[in-house]
């Protein structure tokens, strides 16, 4: 199972970081950005869209960490997006539409 969560913590902020880890990470990155994977461990500016549409969620920094050389040991990515609740919720909702992806539980 691929899991995702807000890793920068809740609350008001200018930037939020959403981390995703697991087998479907590369698929999610490609679907959300409509592009090939960025170079590993290189911060890349990308437009982030709702899955299967061209409707923009946000424009932010994307980082790709292929496993096993990642923090989790699995394929992992980070989305550095604007910190509004609406943007965070839209990204979470879009990721949830990918099969085998779910919101992480506490401590995962």
Predicted segments with their positions:
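A glycine-rich (often HGG/GG-containing) alpha/beta subdomain
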Residues: 1-108
